[in-house]
Design a protein with these regions (language model features):
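Low-complexity, Pro/Ser/Thr/Gly/Ala-rich intrinsically disordered linkers and tails that serve as
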Residues: 1-27, 141-142
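Conserved ATP-binding/catalytic core of the eukaryotic-like protein kinase fold
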Residues: 25-204
Length: 204
């Protein structure tokens, strides 16, 4: 089934597996089979790079011949296929599709896999978790504050689109080799609440 998310994104993106640690370790493991080699919508899943309680994250590539593109595909578990979760995922995807900010990882596409499971296609970001970046680069207090303020501006921007992260932590913020912090995984924490018995909250 063709995805129903935003189309026509032609920019090249980098690759760094640490981007997906937050998603793949947030809620534990699962017994889902490896889907490498399967095509979902316009994308072929190349290799699994993370797995967690909500599903798995794959390195993927655009496979419809339109252009070359490497992305991250987040595929939900089969047993999380409740209508409430699907509806929430659609809502989050629609909100995130309108977010365009240099310090927020872009939602690029989304839809349902051949077996009916929802998936998200996200920008593949090259970078280092912000805490490790600061330590490895030996940043002083002013330099760290500059990064922090940039992150705050990105959070403020996305809040203006009625999206709340709810899981901000160092491994959800990568800093690119050029020093640009990028926020990751908006909406994922909220989605997990719907299937683990936690009351749903309205976006603030």
């Amino acid at each position: 089934m063709e995805p129903d998310g935003p189309e026509g994104v032609e920019s090249d993106v980098g690759a760094f597996d640490a981007f997906y640690l937050a998603f793949s370790t947030a809620l534990g493991g699962s017994d889902e089979p490896d889907m490498a080699g399967v095509r979902i919508g316009r994308y072929e899943l190349l290799e699994e790079i993370g797995r967690g309680g909500m599903g798995a994250v794959y390195k993927a590539r655009r496979a419809d011949g339109a252009f070359e593109q490497v992305v991250a595909a987040k595929l939900l578990r089969r047993d999380l296929g409740t209508e409430a979760l699907h509806a929430q995922l659609r809502n989050e995807r629609q909100l995130l599709a309108h977010v365009d900010h240099p310090n927020i990882a872009r939602l690029m596409d989304g839809g349902r896999a051949p077996d009916g499971r929802p998936f998200l296609v996200m920008e593949y970001v090259e970078g280092t978790p912000i805490d490790r970046y600061c330590q490895e680069r030996g940043l002083n207090t002013d330099e760290r504050l500059d990064l922090f303020l940039t992150v705050c501006e990105a959070v403020q921007h996305v809040h203006g689109h009625l999206v709340v992260h709810q899981d901000l932590k160092p491994r959800n913020i990568l800093v690119t080799p050029g020093g640009r912090p990028v926020l990751l995984d908006f909406g994922i924490a909220r989605l997990s609440e719907l299937d683990v018995g936690v009351a749903e909250e309205s976006p603030a």
